[in-house]
Amino acid sequence: VKIVTALADTDVPVPPVVGYCEDEEVTGAPFYVMEFVEGPVLRSPDQVAQFPEAAQRREIGMNLVDTLASIHAVDPDQVGLGDLGRRDGYVERQLKRWEGQWQKSKTRELPAVETVHERLLAAVPEQGPATIVHGDYRLDNVIYNVLGEVAAVVDWELCTLGDPMADLGLLCVYWVDPGDDSIPLFQPATVEPGFPKKSELVERYVEVSGRDVSALDYFVALGYWKLAIICEGVYARFSAGAYGSEGSDGGADFDATVKMLAARALETTEKL
């Protein structure tokens, strides 16, 4: 609630906060209420049918990038978010956190995951001035209006201060171009005709932000690696029967997804 409240008077579209309650006796935990934001979340190919024109879909992609640039343009100190997190050592902390998560959740040895970790450790880019980092910025974490404009950015749980390239890198991981090799469990809306390619998104980001993206490959590799580890955690819980479907075909999909994400990360580190 602190983040969305702080961003309410900036160029970043967020849902207005109606109220916040710290009394745990009400629901069992502190909670807040936001205003309802009208509009679709574009999570899968069938959900973009309401935007049938190629020009609309292109604008959706460009508006997504423009909004990301607006997040990174906010001065954390000016909006009361200067204490949101440490400003230095962002990548090192990410590597430590997710390597630890891998050791806790892995169900088998995957050399690619370890190799990527070693390569990322050896090639940490120099960090510039820290910005607000959303932490999970992708197409289906925003709400669009009927014009294809970003009405609200949601899911700020991973927000911190750090390197803005982390957001752009993860956006490139989630943004699948038409014709790209598909990954099981990942069928994003962007595979439909009309959406800009991820290379065009990067060009747009440079245009509107003026930022140096020379380290982007590093953060794309980091994004694939983190996502592989997250999916491994889901796969571990799935395999343990936490979802009541142990042994089903879904387990095979999770297994394949982790391996493919790790392979993508490994392939990307070869560019470093």
Per-segment meaning from a language model:
Residues 1-132, 145-148:
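ATP-binding pocket architecture of kinase catalytic cores
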Residues 32-35, 66-69, 96, 100, ...:
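Generic alpha-helical structural context detector
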Residues 43-52, 178-193:
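Short, flexible, glycine-rich and Lys/Arg-enriched loop motifs at helix boundaries
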Residues 85-86, 212-223:
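All-alpha amphipathic helical-bundle segments outside canonical DNA-binding/catalytic cores
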Residues 104, 185-196, 200-212, 229-272:
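ATP/Mg2+ or Mg2+-diphosphate-binding catalytic cores
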Residues 132-134, 139:
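Catalytic-loop of the protein kinase fold
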Residues 143-171, 179-180:
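Catalytic activation segment of kinase domains across protein kinase-like and atypical kinase folds
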